[in-house]
C-alpha cells in the first residue's frame, strides 16, 4: 500500500507527503533470510491456501527484487499474473489484444535550488533555499517562472458541509494563493484527508482563477516533520503517468505548486499584512482553526526548473464476459496493485519483498478469477485489474481510470484488494467506503457468511478510503470499496506489529507468520461481494447526499 496511506496510522506525517521513489541497488539477501523459508507449521494446507501461498512465494521472492514499477523484475511479475489469468480462462483486456496495458511513466524532480523572491514597496527580498523555502517540481514544465501578487486563503479549503469557504471575500484571479498545510483536525477522517491534500487545494485555487500556489508550514507541520527533513528530501524523484508530449499528468489541471515556505519564510511573506504571521500560526494549532482571507501587500516571484526521466510499466487486465445479454455490457472491476517499493536501505537485507503488500492481494485476485471460472460467469462482466505504481501515488489505477480498456460508462463498481494483514485469525472485517453506497448490504451479507462481524473504521482520522487504488474509480463516480481484516481479538496487536516492524521494510516477506487459511476466508468474502454485485438486478449507486458521490457526480440513490 502507498506509504502515505498507512504510515500515518503509526507515525505522524504531513497530509501532503508523497511516497518517494526508492533507489535501486544490486544487493540481495543472505540465504538465511530467504523469503521462501517456511514461516508456519508443517501442517498441510488446503488446496486454496496452498494456491495463495504459491503465488506469494514467487511474487515476493528475492528474484523479484521488490517489484518496483518500471523495473524488469516488475515486468516479469506482470507476465506471471498474465499467465495466471490465461490459466483461469480469462480473456485478455489490455492493449492490442493482449493482457498488458502499457503505462507511460515519468519521474520528475527539482533541478537545482530554484529562486524565490518577495517584492514589497519596490524592494525585492530573496528567500534562502532550505531555510525559507523548498521549491516544488512541476510535472508539466521544465521551467516554471511566475510573478504575481499573493492572496492568503487560510487552509485553502471550500467545504460547505463544514460551513467553510476560505476564499470568501477575496479575488484570486491571476494571483498566487498561499495556504497553510493540512486541514482542521475537527473535520472527519475521509473528507478531511481529501480536503487537506495539496492536489485538492490546487483544484479549488484553479477553479477560482489562481495561477499558482505556495504552502505554508505551521508549528504543527514542523512538529510532524521538521522543515529540514523536507529540504533533505527535495532531491528525490516523484512519479506520475506521462502525457504524449512527455510531461507529467497532474490532477489539479496544470496550476503549479511553486514552493513550501518554512516558518521563517512565512513570517517574511506576511510582513506588512493586516494579520501577523504569529497570529495565524497560533490559530493553526486549533482543532477548528478559522482564518480571514486577505490580499497581501507582496508580489512573489518564483523560478523553478524540473528534470524528467521517462519510464514504462504496465497494468495487467483480463475479462470474464457476463452471461446475461442485457447486463453483460456492465462491468465490475476487481483490482489489486502488483508493484512494491523495490530495493533500498543500508542493511544487508535491502530487498523489500512486499509479501503482504501486496503479493497476497494479487494472489487473492488470481484465486477469485479461478473461482469465478469454476462457478460460472455471472450476469455482468468482471474485469480483473493488476495495477502498477500504486506505491508511487496510485498511478497505474489513475492511468486505467483515464484510459480504460472498456467503455468508461460500463464500469459500475470496484472492489479493491490491498494489503490484507493475514497473520492472525480475524474476527471482524472493515469495509472502507462500504457505508457510502448501496454496496453496504452486499458487503454485510458477504462478511456474515465468513462468521465474523463488520466493524466500523478503527482509525477514521487517517482517511484510508481516499488512499488506495479504488479511490481512482471513486473519482470517476464509481461506487467502490476495499476490505481489511479487522482489529478485534488478536487483530489490533497483529496489525500494530506489522505496521511498526514490517510495513515497507525488507521483513515483509515469507518469514512472517502468515495464516494462509485466513487468506482463503479473505478471498471468499471478496468473491461473494463481487459475485453479488455482478448478479444483482440493479447496479450500485451512491447513498443520497454522499459527499464523494456528489463531488464526483456518480449515480445517486433517490
Q: Over which residues does each language-model region extend?
A:
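Sec-dependent N-terminal signal peptides
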Residues: 1-20
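N-terminal hydrophobic or amphipathic helices/low-complexity stretches enriched
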Residues: 20-94, 265, 329, 558
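Second-shell loop/turn segments in exported
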Residues: 38-46, 62-72, 87, 102-104, ...
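Noncatalytic luminal/extracellular "stalk/propeptide" segments of secretory-pathway proteins
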Residues: 54, 65-184, 295-296, 308, ...
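Soluble metallo-hydrolase cores and metallopeptidase-like ectodomains found primarily
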Residues: 119-121, 129-169, 250-354, 367-370, ...
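Extracellular/luminal Protease-associated
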Residues: 127-249, 321, 329, 350-353, ...
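Metal-dependent peptidase/peptidase-like ectodomains
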Residues: 142-143, 168, 242-279, 377, ...
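His/Asp/Glu-rich mid-to-C-terminal helical/loop segments that flank catalytic regions of hydrolases
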Residues: 370, 374, 484, 490-553, ...
Amino acid at each position: 500500500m502507498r506509504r502515505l496511506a498507512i504510515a500515518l496510522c503509526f507515525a505522524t506525517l504531513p497530509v501532503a507527503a508523497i511516497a518517494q521513489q526508492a533507489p535501486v541497488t544490486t544487493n540481495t539477501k543472505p540465504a538465511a533470510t530467504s523469503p521462501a523459508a517456511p514461516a508456519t507449521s508443517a501442517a498441510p494446507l488446503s488446496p486454496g491456501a496452498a494456491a495463495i501461498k504459491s503465488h506469494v512465494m514467487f511474487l515476493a521472492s528475492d528474484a523479484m527484487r521488490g517489484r518496483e514499477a518500471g523495473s524488469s523484475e516488475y515486468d516479469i511479475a506482470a507476465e506471471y499474473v498474465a499467465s495466471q489469468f490465461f490459466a483461469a480462462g480469462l480473456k485478455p483486456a489490455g492493449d492490442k489484444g493482449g493482457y498488458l496495458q502499457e503505462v507511460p511513466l515519468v519521474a520528475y524532480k527539482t533541478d537545482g535550488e530554484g529562486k524565490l523572491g518577495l517584492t514589497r514597496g519596490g524592494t525585492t527580498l530573496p528567500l534562502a533555499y532550505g531555510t525559507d523555502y523548498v521549491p516544488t517540481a512541476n510535472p508539466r514544465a521544465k521551467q516554471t517562472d511566475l510573478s504575481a501578487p499573493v492572496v492568503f486563503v487560510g487552509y485553502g479549503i471550500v467545504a460547505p458541509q463544514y460551513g467553510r469557504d476560505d476564499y470568501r471575500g477575496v479575488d484570486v484571479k491571476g494571483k498566487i494563493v498561499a495556504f497553510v498545510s493540512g486541514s482542521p483536525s475537527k473535520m472527519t477522517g475521509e473528507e478531511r484527508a481529501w480536503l487537506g491534500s495539496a492536489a485538492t487545494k490546487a483544484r479549488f485555487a484553479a477553479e477560482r482563477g489562481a495561477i499558482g500556489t505556495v504552502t505554508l508550514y505551521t508549528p504543527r507541520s514542523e512538529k510532524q516533520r521538521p522543515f529540514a527533513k523536507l529540504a533533505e528530501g527535495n532531491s528525490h524523484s516523484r512519479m506520475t503517468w506521462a502525457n504524449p508530449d512527455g510531461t507529467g499528468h497532474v490532477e489539479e489541471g496544470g496550476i503549479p505548486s511553486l514552493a513550501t515556505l518554512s516558518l521563517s519564510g512565512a513570517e517574511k511573506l506576511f510582513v506588512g499584512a493586516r494579520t501577523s504571521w504569529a497570529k495565524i500560526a497560533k490559530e493553526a494549532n486549533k482543532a477548528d482553526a478559522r482564518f480571514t482571507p486577505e490580499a497581501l501587500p507582496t508580489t512573489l516571484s518564483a523560478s523553478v526548473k524540473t528534470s524528467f526521466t521517462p519510464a514504462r510499466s504496465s497494468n495487467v487486465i483480463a475479462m470474464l464476459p457476463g452471461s446475461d445479454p442485457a447486463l453483460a455490457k456492465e462491468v465490475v472491476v476487481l483490482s489489486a496493485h502488483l508493484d512494491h517499493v523495490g530495493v533500498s536501505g543500508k542493511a544487508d537485507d535491502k530487498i523489500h519483498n512486499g509479501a503482504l503488500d501486496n503479493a497476497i492481494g494479487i494472489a487473492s485476485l488470481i484465486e477469485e478469477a479461478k473461482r469465478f471460472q469454476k462457478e460460472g460467469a455471472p450476469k455482468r462482466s468482471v474485469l480483473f485489474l493488476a495495477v502498477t505504481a500504486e506505491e508511487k501515488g496510485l498511478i497505474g489505477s489513475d492511468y486505467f481510470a483515464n484510459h480504460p480498456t472498456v467503455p468508461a460508462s460500463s464500469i459500475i463498481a470496484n472492489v479493491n484488494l490491498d494489503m490484507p494483514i493475514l497473520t492472525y485469525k480475524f474476527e471482524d472485517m472493515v469495509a472502507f467506503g462500504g457505508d457510502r453506497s448501496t454496496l453496504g448490504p452486499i458487503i454485510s451479507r458477504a462478511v456474515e457468511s465468513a462468521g465474523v462481524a463488520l466493524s466500523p473504521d478503527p482509525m477514521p482520522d487517517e482517511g484510508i478510503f481516499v488512499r488506495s487504488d479504488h479511490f481512482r474509480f471513486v473519482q470517476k463516480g464509481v461506487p467502490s470499496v476495499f476490505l481489511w481484516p479487522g482489529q478485534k481479538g488478536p487483530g489490533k496487536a497483529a496489525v500494530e506489529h506489522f505496521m511498526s516492524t514490517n510495513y515497507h521494510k525488507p521483513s515483509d516477506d515469507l518469514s512472517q507468520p502468515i495464516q494462509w487459511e485466513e487468506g482463503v476466508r479473505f478471498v471468499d468474502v471478496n468473491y461473494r461481494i463481487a459475485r453479488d454485485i455482478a448478479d444483482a438486478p440493479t447496479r450500485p449507486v451512491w447513498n443520497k447526499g454522499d459527499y464523494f458521490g456528489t463531488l464526483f457526480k456518480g449515480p445517486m440513490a433517490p
